[in-house]
Structures are given as structure tokens and as C-alpha cells.
Amino acid sequence: MHLSGDDVIVWQYGVVKLNQTIVMTWVIMVFLAGGSAFLTRRLSSGIRISRWQSFLEMIVTMAMQQIREIGLRQPEKYLSYLATLFLFVATAVLFTIIPGYEPPTGSLSTTAALALSVFVAVPLYGIERVGFGAYLKSYMKPTFIMLPFNIISEFSRTLALAVRLFGNMMSGVMIIGILLGIAPLFFPVLMSVLGLLTGMVQAYIFSMLATVYIAAATKSRDE
């Protein structure tokens, strides 16, 4: 059992290698894109809507309400990005029920890429909200001496996001691998269920931390 899909080479041409992590990342992205298109193909803007559309709207409303409670006044502007983060991590976890599947989130390269997207999104949303000059000045609050510390803080929390998600996902894979050698039937099933629950919690925490960072960039920086 491999701890990471990085170790499994699916295709290679010279120095160019395509590992399982990259393949499964694209599989998840295609699955989410195709699933979204399929589930929303019959949505209506009219008065009469289906029960399915009513259910989807209820979920979207709940998500926007939670985003608003964190501090983002216009949650619809951020919902697509934050929901994509959650759905990607959650889907990567749910696919672990497939035999032989290794979640791409068990690779530091994937979690680093997700954290990097948050690192880029935070200043973009902040600049869009308060302007380029005001956003840059926020790094010198309450005094210009804080500039290097605020910059270090931006990088350190990005690293923390990547390592936190990677550590939790990798630990689940390692525990299941160990228990497979002890009790090939009972323990892996139990740990798989617990792993799914833990993974969903991690997906939620990751997206909520991204929401908090964006809220800090668009709210507190403008005060």
C-alpha cells in the first residue's frame, strides 16, 4: 500500500512523469464539472420549481448564511470559490471507498496547491473590496514596524493550511494501512468510516479557514 499517489507512476515519457495524484486530481475535477452540469441542467428561474431545485436552493441558502455570519456581506461573490474548495476535498475523501484509490489530498503537492489558491484569492478579494493602495497599507497597521511580521503571517498561515490538511489525510491512510496488516476485515472497515467522517470535517475546516482569511482581508482591513 502506497502512502501517496506520488509514488505510483501511471505514464512516463523521458523525464516527464504522470503520477496517480495528478490523474486522480483531474478525475475529481472532471467528476465535479460533469456532476454540476448534470445536476443543474433542469433548473428553472420561474415560480414553479422542482423539489430537487428547492433542495439545492436550500443548501445554497444555508451556505451563504454561514459565509455571511463569518463576516462576508456579499456571500454570493465568494460562494463559488469556497464551495469548490469544500467539494474538491470532500469528493477526494468520499472516493476512498473505491478499492485501490489513493486520495490526492494525501499528497503535500495537492494540499500545497489548494493552500496556494487561498493565498492568491485572499489579496485578490481584499484588493477588489478596498482597493490596491488601502490593502497594501493594511500591512503597516497599527504601525509600519508590523510590515514584515504581517507578510510572514501571510506565508505561515498558507503553510499551516497545506500541512494541516496533508497531515490529517496522510494519517488516515497510514492508520488504515497498519490495521490492514493486523485485522484485514474488521478494522479497515471501521477506520474507513471514521476516515470519511474525519475527511469531511477537514474539508469543512479548510473551506471555513479560507472564508475567515477572506473576511479578514475584505472587512478588518477596511476599518
UniProtKB/Swiss-Prot annotation:
GO MF term list: proton-transporting ATP synthase activity, rotational mechanism
Cellular component GO terms held in the UniProt record: plasma membrane; proton-transporting ATP synthase complex
Membrane-spanning segments: 20-40, 78-98, 107-127, 173-193, 194-214
Xref: SUPFAM superfamilies: F1F0 ATP synthase subunit A
Transcription listed as a keyword: no
Compartments in which it is found: Cell inner membrane
HAMAP family the UniProt entry points to: ATP_synth_a_bact
Role played: Key component of the proton channel; it plays a direct role in the translocation of protons across the membrane.
Family the entry assigns: Belongs to the ATPase A chain family.
UniProt name for this protein: ATP synthase subunit a 1
Name of the gene this protein is made from: atpB1
